[in-house]
Structures are given as structure tokens and as C-alpha cells.
Amino acid sequence: MLEKLIILDFGSQTTQLIARRIRELNTYCEVYPYNKLPEDLSGVRGIILSGSPYSVYDSKAFRIELSELRGKLPLLGICYGAQSLVHQAGGKVEPCDSREYGRTHLTLRQPDDALLTGLQSGTTVWMSHGDTITSLPEGFEVIAGTEDVPNAAFRIRGEKTWGVQFHPEIYHSEEGTKLLGNFLDICGMKRDWTPASFIEATVQELRERLGDDKVILALSGGVDSSVVAVLLNKAIGRNLTCIFVDHGLLRKGEFERVLQDYEHLGLNVIGVNAKEKFFAALSGVTDPEQKRKIIGRGFIEVFDEEARKLKDIKWLGQGTIYPDVIESLSITGMVIKSHHNVGGLPERMNLRLVEPLRMLFKDEVRRVGLELGMMPHLIHRHPFPGPGLGIRILGEITEEKATILQNADDIYMSLMREWGLYDQVWQAGAILLPVRSVGVMGDERTYEYTVALRAVTSMDAMSADWVHLPYDFLAKVSNEIINKVRGVNRVVYDISSKPPSTIEWE
């Protein structure tokens, strides 16, 4: 049985960073909403309680009865999680005079404590809280503190329960990963979850789950669906039929290039031209969420139609990855934006879903692909959304706009490769804005579209920083697009990071 750690999410923006750090330590973990702890805890070796935007005293704060968890499994509370342990046990948590945010130095009071093994006294940690623990309940003891936060870390005597008021998952906490590793050792984790072990377990699981059933797989040309294709092919061979849909919103020349790539992989691929269907369905639609749902529904309908042409197809494969799942539903149940792989699907489907990468982050998918021996140019391609340029054309989608954006995007990507910037950027693309502006070309006044350029660096799509591309490069791209793409007379560069912005505009 796969051993794992569970992270209970109380709404923190850094919950997924906790998961990333744990995965980096070759340990499998899963994130669950704070009130959705699985009843079956077999295989679970420990639990981490995340931070939260709330105070323990807020009426809307996310609460569970922590006494029911204490003593059963090793427990680590981070920030709000630590404060909740103290508050529920009768200790004092009070507002800070001013919010404590940023770097500080941690003094170890009990350096021999199992959670602090190997840490240096004075190590830098990252604080981010508005409340602080001022008094610990009986049975709780301080193991580390800072100048302003004397109870920065504690443990409960006689239990494998700890709390820290700083954030070990944040990069600025110098030895945060070491602390999390110590907790994994306390939990008795083997730390043997690797790409090779994932492939072995997943292929075995797919064979058991699918048996002799036939599967069709949604191909996009991106790394996610490519890795899924190779995994499924390894598990069930010719029982896999890959479906690649041209919805008219792919990058320029993408349809032909992708078909060629997959033929080289020995996959059974059917190419479907469904441009007219998608453009007709999207006509007049401007709402981003509605567009996503239409595109998602269109995909499933096309797959359903293709499945009927084939015999005995029972499963639909998809390249859903963990950030897709996490982004689709917030902790409160409020939709952030539906993802094309996990939202926008019709209620009735004639096929069951199989999503082998559902619990992997993007960088983990790439490592799995390399372990599978896939071609580097497939593995290191920039992420490209399933709805394609459909979520990069703001406002109504038309075939004319799609052509404009394809041409602009092609210039941007080609120059990025030419300048040696492509592999330095995690994701890049052009966006067609629903904004026309006045320009002058030759002696004539123009009134044409604006294109925005986007380029970000990221590890896992949960957070992203905009890339400081050279001005000379941006000037070259702008000049080429304006001169060569009919319908565009202005180019701008997006300098927004995630959060608060998302990577895609819609």
C-alpha cells in the first residue's frame, strides 16, 4: 500500500507549497479541505495542518475538532494550524500589535528535539501572521522562539504533535525543507516515492483498473497528455486510441506537427478537424467561464462521437494534473475558474474518465516523461491550455481573431527560440485583447487590435513571476507583429505575477 502524508487545507495561499516541499523529499502527499479528512486512513503516516487567512477567533474561521486527531498520527500545525492546537487546548492566542511579516531568526530552545534535528540556531524563517501565541496550555513546551515570537515552535509532551508559527514551506525559511524532512522521519516515511516508482505503480494500477477495456485519449500536444499517452500505451498497448482535435484554436501549424510527433512514438492517433463546430458554438459568447464550458463540452462531444465510430470504447483519458484540480475549487467551495479538464463537462458522459497524472505537479510530470524516455522537445514544451487560444482571445471568439492571434503568437514563439530565451521561460504566449486603439501606418490612420505578451517563470503553476525579458527582444517582437500581422497596431507586455493574477487571462 502506498504510504502518504495528508495536508489539511484551512485556506492558506501556501498550502500547495507545503505539498511541493513534501513531494521534493520523495514522499507522496495529498491535499484535502480541512473538513474532508478521509475516513480510511490506512497508509496515512502523518498529518499537516496548513495556515489560514482567518484568526482562530473569527466567526467564519475554518474549524475542526483537533483533539480527535491528536495522538493518533504524528501532527504538525503550521501558523494557523499551530494556533488552533493551542487555542483548542486552552492556551492564549492574541492579536499582534502589528502584523508579523517577513524574515526573522529562530533561536533553538531544545535543539535535540526530533523536529529540529540538524537545524542551526539563528536560522532564518519566514513569518506571516496577525495573531501570536502568548501562552501555551499545560503539556505544551517551547522548542524554539524568535525575538518577537517567543513561542515560535512547540511540541506536546507525550504526543507526536508539533506546531510552528513560521512557514517552513516558504523558500525564505532557509532550513524549512530540513524541518519538514524531520517531520517525515518522525512519521516513519521511507522517502522512496520517485518517478520510477510512480511509473511502476501507475502502470500496474492502470492494467488492473482497465483490464482489456479500450480507451480513447484526448491529446493536446502538450507534455501532460503526451505523458499520459505513453503511460497508457505502456499499460494497455493497442487498446489505446488517441484523439487529437483541431478546434481552430491551436497554435499555428500545431495540428500537423503534433500528429507527426505522436506517429514517431508509435501511438495510434486519429486527427479530427472540428473547427466549424467550435466556432459555431462560441459565436457571440463573451463570458470567460461560459467559453471554457463550451470548449470543454465540445471536446467531450467530439470524443463521444469518435468513440461511437470505434468498438467497445469505455474510457476517456485526460491529462489532468494536480494544479488543475486544486484551482477548480477553492476551500470554501467557491469556483475560481473551471479547468478545461475538470470543469465544463456535461453531466452525462458515455465514457468513464481515467486521469493517471491527476495527483502530479507539472515538474513531476516532466520528470516522469524523461524517465519514460520521451523526446526532450515534447517534455520541455511550454504548458499550453486545453482550450488553447480560446482563453487567450478575450471577448467573442471568431475565426478571424484566431488567425490574428495564431500569427502574432507564432512570431513571439519563433523569436523566443531564435534569441535563446525559450528554455529560460516556463510559459509564454500572446493574448488578443478586446481593445482597439488608434495608430498610424504610413500616412493612414488605423484602428486595430492590441496584443499582450505574457511570459512567466514557475515551478508548478501555483505561483508565477513575470519574466524580465530584454527590451531589445520585446522591441523586436512588437515591431515584427505590428508589421506582419494584419489587424494589430499595438503590443503591450504583461508584468503581473501570480498571485494575485492568474497565468492565463481567462
Curated annotation (Swiss-Prot):
Residues 193-381 form the GMPS ATP-PPase domain. Signal peptide: none annotated. The keyword ATP-binding applies. It catalyses: XMP + L-glutamine + ATP + H2O = GMP + L-glutamate + AMP + diphosphate + 2 H(+). InterPro entries: Class_I_gatase-like, GATASE, GMP_synth_C, GMP_synth_GATase, GMP_synthase, GMPS_ATP_PPase_dom, NAD/GMP_synthase, Rossmann-like_a/b/a_fold. The active site is at C79, H167, E169. Keywords: ATP-binding, Glutamine amidotransferase, GMP biosynthesis, Ligase, Nucleotide-binding, Purine biosynthesis. GO terms for molecular function: ATP binding; GMP synthase activity. Pathway: Purine metabolism; GMP biosynthesis; GMP from XMP (L-Gln route): step 1/1. The keyword Nucleotide-binding applies. SUPFAM superfamilies: Adenine nucleotide alpha hydrolases-like, Class I glutamine amidotransferase-like, GMP synthetase C-terminal dimerisation domain. One of its GO terms (cellular component) is cytosol. CDD domains: GATase1_GMP_Synthase, GMP_synthase_C. Disulfide bonds: none annotated. PROSITE patterns: GATASE_TYPE_1, GMPS_ATP_PPASE. Gene3D superfamilies: 3.30.300.10, 3.40.50.880, HUPs (3.40.50.620). Its EC number is 6.3.5.2. ATP binds at S220, G221, G222, V223, D224, S225, S226. Residues 4-192 form the Glutamine amidotransferase type-1 domain. Homodimer. Catalyzes the synthesis of GMP from XMP. This is GMP synthase [glutamine-hydrolyzing]. It comes from Porphyromonas gingivalis (strain ATCC BAA-308 / W83).
